[in-house]
Amino acid sequence: MAFNDLLKQVGGVGRFQLIQVTMVVAPLLLMASHNTLQNFTAAIPAHHCRPPANANLSKDGGLEAWLPLDKQGRPESCLRFPFPHNGTEANGTGVTEPCLDGWVYDNSTFPSTIVTEWNLVCSHRAFRQLAQSLFMVGVLLGAMMFGYLADRLGRRKVLILNYLQTAVSGTCAAYAPNYTVYCIFRLLSGMSLASIAINCMTLNMEWMPIHTRAYVGTLIGYVYSLGQFLLAGIAYAVPHWRHLQLAVSVPFFVAFIYSWFFIESARWYSSSGRLDLTLRALQRVARINGKQEEGAKLSIEVLQTSLQKELTLNKGQASAMELLRCPTLRRLFLCLSMLWFATSFAYYGLVMDLQGFGVSMYLIQVIFGAVDLPAKFVCFLVINSMGRRPAQLASLLLAGICILVNGIIPRGHTIIRTSLAVLGKGCLASSFNCIFLYTGELYPTMIRQTGLGMGSTMARVGSIVSPLISMTAEFYPSIPLFIFGAVPVAASAVTALLPETLGQPLPDTVQDLKSRSRGKQKQQQLEQQKQMIPLQVSTQEKNGL
């Protein structure tokens, strides 16, 4: 409780918290756009083979003479006749060939995408999904690397670097001359965006008192959801993929400029043993919050007394290996990894297939964003009233059930299937909201950012595996849905192994975690003893004593 008392002394939730939270959270609007950007920049418009250069369509009988029809009576996308198909014996054999002269695309909805510019269709169709997978690989690498660096160098320095990297790599991707260069810059964007997400949560949470952490976590979730609305609007207004890529990347230059005014986490300073910087940060916050007199009362000696436990126990450098060495941290790491993986695995299985719903992609994008608002509000109520653990369990379990039921319903029931998918997506968005907050509250300060980074890493593993599972639909259409639904249902059971953090102070050390666990065991023993006392009295009364 020592550091929380210091926060209250310098103003609790004051002007500084409101300003910094707003500035840190604002870029998340466009982070949501980057994560699902390829739904629009890599959209696949209707297309068919281009007839040979020497073809005379007016003489041959029109375009239909060169294009075979599929089972639905539509022109084939990847095949054409080698000669005009006019019903003669020579040309009526059904012999086809690939699109040797390229493709003709329907540009009415999407004037230009990476698919149409680099012909990522037919035999090259897998390259479209590869670009998104490489972006997620970047997110995975960024979560691992920058999560560790943030625990070593601080949250503020890493955020400044991440804003610049996102702005530069995103802008360069918009001017990529070929597919390979585009993928490289998208990977770099993914690395920095992963770090922005986890550093945003941590920096805000470490400057907030206990009773406000759930509010901040919910706010971050809502900003991300609003970013999905924003993407639909920007993509509709800017349909050209290069212009859209620029529109969601250039604003990060603004974030890079104002991020120099962020104040580093005093909690991180103290956990690193740098009391001079801790004092300076707290006094600066006190001035902004109008608590100069309270800030003046602070000194190195006061901090040494207040933070004696943290300074004694936080001597070692945090590393990812600590998550496996310590039994207490190892159990947390394994359980949280399963929750992160399951949430991301099912989430991206749904949101990266907007064209599969058979309706306007812009409309589905808006609906997917809209469902987050009530879903996250309900999650917020559960988090604050019942706790983090029930909220995490319910969101994963309900999401899995919705997806599993969706796999059973026949394909013709479009409205029901879409409704279940939207409901499942809302539950998974709530799960993301909860797991960010829950993870940050479970790990001690000395390794919190590393823990969040490793959790985000497991989430990216899920998002990378998800497209591979989607490919199993070629064998049976419902196989992906059964898998996407079963994983979160199974993972929901893991929440029973995690402690509740509602109303608990943030742990600063591993010792805090162990003390909390021992305190819970003692409380359970006392409750059992209280239940046994009336029974003993009742037995004595029956014996006439």
From Swiss-Prot:
How does the record describe the protein's post-translational processing? Glycosylated. Glycosylation is necessary for proper targeting of the transporter to the plasma membrane.
Keywords for the protein's UniProt record, in alphabetical order: Cell membrane, Glycoprotein, Membrane, Transmembrane, Transmembrane helix
Q: Which PANTHER family match?
A: SOLUTE CARRIER FAMILY 22 MEMBER (PTHR24064)
In what ranges is there compositional bias, type Polar residues?
Answer: 536-545
- Per the record, ranges on the Extracellular side are 31-129, 178-180, 240-242, 353-362, 411-419, 472-478
Question: Record's superkingdom?
Answer: Eukaryota
Residue ranges, annotated region (Disordered) = 515-545
The glycosylation sites annotated in the UniProt record are 39, 56, 86, 91, 107, 178
> What reaction gets catalysed by this protein?
(6R)-L-erythro-5,6,7,8-tetrahydrobiopterin(out) + a dicarboxylate(in) = (6R)-L-erythro-5,6,7,8-tetrahydrobiopterin(in) + a dicarboxylate(out); L-erythro-7,8-dihydrobiopterin(out) + a dicarboxylate(in) = L-erythro-7,8-dihydrobiopterin(in) + a dicarboxylate(out); L-sepiapterin(out) + a dicarboxylate(in) = L-sepiapterin(in) + a dicarboxylate(out); prostaglandin F2alpha(out) + a dicarboxylate(in) = prostaglandin F2alpha(in) + a dicarboxylate(out)
Q: What is known of its domains?
A: Multiple cysteine residues are necessary for proper targeting to the plasma membrane.
Q: What else is known?
A: Involved in the renal transport of a variety of drugs with well-known nephrotoxic potential, therefore may play a role in the etiology of the drug-associated nephrotoxicity. Uptakes the diagnostic agent PAH/para-aminohippurate and clinically used drugs. Mediates the bidirectional transport of PAH/para-aminohippurate.
Main location as per UniProt: membrane
- Tell me what topology the record assigns in the membrane: Multi-pass membrane protein
**Listed Low complexity bias regions:** 522-531
Q: Which residues lie on this side of the membrane: Cytoplasmic?
A: 1-9, 151-157, 202-218, 264-331, 384-389, 441-450, 500-545
Q: Name one GO cellular component term.
A: plasma membrane
* Functional summary from the UniProt entry: Secondary active transporter that functions as a Na(+)-independent organic anion (OA)/dicarboxylate antiporter where the uptake of one molecule of OA into the cell is coupled with an efflux of one molecule of intracellular dicarboxylate such as 2-oxoglutarate or glutarate. Mediates the uptake of OA across the basolateral side of proximal tubule epithelial cells, thereby contributing to the renal elimination of endogenous OA from the systemic circulation into the urine.
Q: In which tissues is it expressed?
A: Expressed in kidney. In kidney, restricted to the proximal convoluted tubule (representing S1 and S2 segments). In brain, expressed in neurons of the cortex cerebri and hippocampus as well as in the ependymal cell layer of the choroid plexus.
Q: Please state what the protein is called.
A: Solute carrier family 22 member 6
Q: Where are the transmembrane segments?
A: 10-30, 130-150, 158-177, 181-201, 219-239, 243-263, 332-352, 363-383, 390-410, 420-440, 451-471, 479-499
- Family classification: Belongs to the major facilitator (TC 2.A.1) superfamily. Organic cation transporter (TC 2.A.1.19) family.
Which locations, inside or outside the cell, does it occupy?
A: Basolateral cell membrane; Basal cell membrane
What Pfam families does the record point to? Sugar_tr
Q: Which GO terms describe its biological process?
A: alpha-ketoglutarate transport; metanephric proximal tubule development; monoatomic anion transport; organic anion transport; prostaglandin transport; renal tubular secretion; sodium-independent organic anion transport
> Which InterPro entries does the UniProt record give?
MFS_dom, MFS_sugar_transport-like, MFS_trans_sf, Orgcat_transp/SVOP
Record GO terms (molecular function): alpha-ketoglutarate transmembrane transporter activity; antiporter activity; chloride ion binding; identical protein binding; organic anion transmembrane transporter activity; prostaglandin transmembrane transporter activity; sodium-independent organic anion transmembrane transporter activity; solute:inorganic anion antiporter activity
